[in-house]
Amino acid sequence: SECLVGSEMCIRDRAYVAGILHDVMKEEEPSVQRAYIEKAGERMSNLEIRIGKVYHQMSGAAYARLELGITDPDILHAIRYHTTARRGMSLLEQIIYLADFISADRHYKDVETMRAKVDEGLEPGMFYALTYTITDLARQGRPIHPDTVDAYNWVLERRG
C-alpha cells in the first residue's frame, strides 16, 4: 500500500529517513561536527561541548536540514535527540531513540533486558532506557545531559 498521502509522509517513511540519517555525522571529526552545529545556528552549552557523544546528534540534524533539505521537524527532532532523548518526545522520536538503543550492533551488559522491555511497548522501553542511561552515567561519574533528565521525568510523569 502507498504510504505517501499528499505531501505528508507516514510514520513508517519518516522512521526510515530518520533511521538512515540519525548517525550520518557520527564518524566525522568533532571540528566538522561543531562547524555544522554552528552553521545551523545552534549554540552548544558548555556541558554539550564536554559531552562529545552528543555532537553527532546535533550535527546530524543540522546536516539533514542544511545539506539534504529535510524540513520535517519530526524527522529533524528524531535525529537531534536520538542520543539524549528529551521531554515531550513524539512517537517517531521515541522509536528512533529506542531502535538506536537496541540495534543489533549493541553489546552492552543489559541489552537483552532492554530489548525485552521495548518488546513490551514504548513506555516500558523508554523508562528502562532512560533509567539505565542515567544510572550508568552516574556510576561512571560522567555528566548527564539535562535533556536526558527531563525525558526521564517526563516518562515518569506519564506513568502516573
Question: What are these model-predicted stretches?
Answer:
Residues 135-160:
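Charged phosphate-binding loop/patch that engages nucleotide di/tri-phosphates or the phosphate backbone
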